[in-house]
Amino acid sequence: FDKVMKCTEERKGISLRTKEYYELLLDTYADDAFITLAYFHIHDMLKETKERYEKCLFDLDNCPENAKKKRFTLEELKDSLEKKISKYEEDVKTYGETVCVCGTLTVKYGHTSEILYAGMNEDFKRLMGPYLTWYKTMEKCFELGCKTSNMGGIEGTLKGGLVDFKEIYHPRINEYIGEFDIPVNSLLYNVAFKFYKKIKERNAKHK
């Protein structure tokens, strides 16, 4: 899970949490926290694609010359399978026979749950693994007795890729006022805020 979260950090240019933090969540919430992961068996898919490729070559060899439409379709399939084989072979070299492509970390409390973190390996975006992973995550929440499953926030404009993705699950959107600070001591707040900014600037330099 930590690996796919690192992929998300790199893709978005942000810093999220450490592996130790995710472990702390799981330890703290125990049976009320779980991770859902999706794996892609590259080696199996490579083997299956090679078998399809061999059959395609056989069909091409036995395709009549006057069957132009069928031959054209087979030629296109041949090119597509060659590209897939090349891609899968590269993936096996990079990731091995099996790779985790995406995952979620969820915490349950009361009759609801929060999908707190979700990550995806961009190299396998084409598989659209998050769609099934999120579905299975929410399915698990309902099996545990939850009446709702919080999918997290979206853009305020109700536009963008995140909205398009979450819209598939027919969510109910709740709009809140947002985050803000209410200083109970103006003097201490100003001092603390300046100190906080300096720490952030220092940490940013060391990354």
Regions found by a protein language model. Give the residues of each.
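A conserved beta-strand-loop-helix scaffold within acyl/acetyltransferase catalytic domains
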Residues: F1-K125
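Short amphipathic alpha-helical patches
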Residues: L24-D32, M45-Y53, E139, D164-F165, ...
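Acyl-donor binding region in acyl/amide transferases
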Residues: G96-P171
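Short C-terminal domain-edge/linker segments immediately following a structured domain
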Residues: E20-L24, A67-K69, W134-M138, G145-S149, ...
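Active-site/acyl-donor-binding loops of N-acyltransferases
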Residues: L144-K207
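Glycine-rich loops and low-complexity Gly/Arg-rich segments
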Residues: G13-R17, L60-P64, P130-Y131, E139-C141, ...
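Aromatic-enriched hydrophobic runs in primary sequence
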Residues: K3, E9-E10, T18-K19, T112, ...
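General N-terminal targeting signals
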Residues: T18, Y39, Y53-K55, A118, ...
